[in-house]
């Protein structure tokens, strides 16, 4: 590539002469009007276009999400699209508050077929388009500015004559100067204004002017400048519903749309998960959830994102990428040790404070708001630290290891992760935990009992039977509570040198078969004064810590 100079082949996009641009200081505080084009733009890009059952399934999904405008096809260009349009109308499958949209080019016979397909509908948008860009005028149409403008006006006039066959207000009109971003702004404005005049647009009956980034050609700020320039220069802005139709050729379709909304747009056409020609249309799911995470109601229902993914994948036969914003299966997953630690602490803080505001590091959205679970937030591999294995023990098994035990235990997990090079699942972590703490060592608890020495005395007497080297040995001692007494008995009988330095306990489940998990830390007086941890699990809150002491002693 170093020998190739791209400027000899490619021309950079020119800046827009927009003085005192306002969009950089604006914020998005309301959802736009959304129009799904999954059934047209999305469908035409598929290797195997959707059949009627799949189209119907997707249409019903879009309706249930809250879309009020849905482009259902190009009836005059495809028998399948025509039949689908008629099927929806004749079977009364279009809710009263939903407007269907159909696409047509500026040719009389196509317009005739389009209006024929709409007979009997309650509300529809007829979307007229023709390409007006400099390149297409030169290469495709071989016409000058006047010739291409007349294509739009001829189509607009012909459509106007069709409206008297429908009740007033049933048909709404939309015009797109296709390839808008490759068109001189003054010319795009000229064509749009004359179409608006032809259709007698006014504040009471506005026309949708849709400005497509048919091919994304520049950085997002350029598109925002173009939209603000157009918005500022319409002779009567009140008669225009300014719509966006961005594509994602440069990978910045979402950003371009957001900036263009800040620049004054009212409406967005896009698809679920960005399906569409080439690199796709703008992704309405990402756009909507970006708004949601800024405290803005997107007016679309994303609360069961997994079901939405399943439907989209079934209908399009295209997978949603694992790293797709919000939707991907790995989006809410952390493998990095530092990330896991921050997430775990953030989740603990949220739980303890009961605050409504969502503030968790590395998680811009609460997964539960989109129907995701917390199970996959943290997963463990060779890049993970102590927080990952500790989180999985806590979430899946209600085991809350003390911090020191977390560090020691994570080393065992890390060793396996390094040697295998694979993900360490929750079940594998539990298996490691059992081998570390719940194994049968040389000391085994056979029997245990405790009783208070007297009513007025806090001391207790414990009596236990320990299996040691296959021999049952009875032990007993008194102390301030059963744990202290048992530690004393073990030290005295087996000449063990250690001291109990910490103890904690939690319930693992509720009900008549509830289990308790106990954790002890003992200090061994070797040259490092090391800590050894033990864990005990039992339905008895008295026996669980006794088993934890045995576990720790077996691990010395």
What is each of the regions a protein language model found here?
Residues 41, 45-46, 75-79, 133-135, ...:
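Short, small-residue-enriched loops and turns at beta-alpha junctions
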